[in-house]
Amino acid sequence: MMQFILGFTLGNVVGMYLAQNYEVPNISKKIEAFKKDVEAKKKPPE
C-alpha cells in the first residue's frame, strides 16, 4: 500500500511539473499551414 501511495504521489508531482514547463504546440496554426499547403497543391501550374 505504501508503495502505491508513493508511486501515485511521485507520478502526480512529475506530471504537474511537466504540465507547467512543457511548451504545448499550437495545433490550430499547424492545421492552417496544412490547409494552405493543400490549397497550393490543388491549383494547377500555369
From Swiss-Prot:
Transmembrane segments annotated in the record for this chain: 7-23
Subcellular location: Mitochondrion inner membrane; Mitochondrion outer membrane; Mitochondrion intermembrane space
Organism superkingdom: Eukaryota
One Pfam family, short name: DUF4535
GO terms under biological process: innate immune response; mitochondrial respirasome assembly; mitochondrial respiratory chain complex III assembly; positive regulation of interleukin-1 beta production; positive regulation of NLRP3 inflammasome complex assembly
GO cellular component, one term: mitochondrial inner membrane
Effect of loss of the gene: Morpholino knockdown of the protein leads to various development defects, including smaller eye, abnormal head shape, malformations of the jaw, cardiac edema and a delayed yolk sac resorption. Most animals die by 1 week of age.
Alphabetized UniProt keyword annotations: Immunity, Innate immunity, Membrane, Mitochondrion, Mitochondrion inner membrane, Mitochondrion outer membrane, Transmembrane, Transmembrane helix
Membrane topology qualifier: Single-pass membrane protein
Main location: mitochondrion
Tissue expression: Widely expressed. Expressed more abundantly in brain compared with other tissues such as heart, muscle and liver.
Free-text function comment from the UniProt entry: Microprotein involved in mitochondrial respiratory chain complex III (ubiquinol-cytochrome c oxidoreductase) and complex IV (mitochondrial cytochrome c oxidase complex) assembly. Required for the formation of mitochondrial supercomplexes (SCs). Also required for the activation of the NLRP3 inflammasome.
Family: Belongs to the STMP1 family.
UniProt protein name: Short transmembrane mitochondrial protein 1
Source species: Danio rerio
Gene transcribed to yield this protein: stmp1
